[in-house]
Regions:
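Bacterial Sec-dependent N-terminal signal peptides
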Residues: 1-29
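A generic structural micro-environment signature
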Residues: 7, 12-15, 55-57, 65, ...
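Extracellular glycan-targeting catalytic surfaces
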Residues: 20-220, 232, 236
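RNA pseudouridine synthases
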Residues: 129, 225-228
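Alpha-helix initiation and capping sites
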Residues: 228-232, 248
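Long, repeat-rich segments with strong aromatic
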Residues: 240-253
């Protein structure tokens, strides 16, 4: 699954440099004549997003042997302020990533998405520490961050049902990191079988999926304005949410 994901991103990146709506002689391409892509069913052996169980086993063996560079890398993780089990989540009711010039006066919290960025980093790093050390305090801390956002955040800020600034689309960058943390924590105290886990999956899907899918379809009605980084933010959000929720339709998108 990991290699499929890396391959997909590599191909997408390559195509971004060579894609064109015309062939060499100038004749337009009729994309409607192309065959529909084959739908593939992936067997998901969780965890299977950025890291697999085999990856964790490999790293734990290296750490047990104090092998380098793994030992130094883990020491760096241990020293991170985001990997401290005393870390406290700071969820917001409505996420905002707004342009300062246009929105600072009306929305003093115009960049409160940074709360999510920090908490996503902490949830992921704490999940790694739990998985690599088997110490409960790290699993508890990571889980509490994810639960706090699922319980307290209502989504991305909108007015009249629409985003008010295209920069809000980039909040999707955090979806992948959040989903990775949750994917790692599936096995923590059977969290993946709990109502808390289901609530988190529902929250991350309702917050990010529709926005990401709509952007990939319409590109905010200005397709020539957006570069590939905007697409990748939405693609990784959809793929990671699909893996987390075992949703083959999302994965195939």
């Amino acid at each position: 699954m990991k290699m499929d994901f890396i391959y997909t991103l590599a191909v997408t990146a390559a195509l971004s440099f060579c894609s064109c709506t015309e062939i060499e002689d100038g004749a337009p391409i009729n994309f409607d004549e192309w065959e529909a892509p084959e739908k593939i069913e992936f067997t998901l052996n969780h965890p299977c997003m950025l890291h697999s169980e085999a990856d964790f086993t490999y790293v734990k063996e290296k750490l047990a042997a104090s092998a380098q560079p793994w030992a130094d890398a883990y020491a760096s993780l241990e020293s991170s302020k985001f990997a401290n089990p005393a870390y406290q989540a700071d969820p917001v009711e409505w996420l905002k990533r707004l342009d300062k010039t246009n929105w600072e006066n009306k929305h003093p919290d115009y960049v409160n998405y940074t709360n999510l960025a920090n908490d996503a980093a902490a949830a992921y790093q704490l999940a790694l520490r739990w998985k690599l050390s088997d110490k409960k305090e790290y699993g508890d801390a990571a889980k509490s961050i994810l639960n706090a956002w699922a319980k307290n955040c209502k989504g991305i800020y909108r007015e009249n049902g629409s985003l008010i600034d295209p920069n809000e689309l980039l909040i999707a960058i955090q979806a992948y990191q959040l989903a990775n943390a949750a994917e790692i924590l599936r096995g923590y105290d059977k969290w993946g079988e709990t109502e808390e886990f289901k609530a988190f999956v529902q929250w991350i899907e309702s917050t990010f999926y529709a926005m990401a899918d709509d952007f990939l379809v319409r590109h905010n009605n200005t397709a020539d304005h957006y570069w590939l980084n905007w697409d990748l933010a939405q693609m990784t959000a959809i793929l990671s949410i699909g893996i987390l929720s075992d949703n083959q339709e999302m994965i195939n998108k």
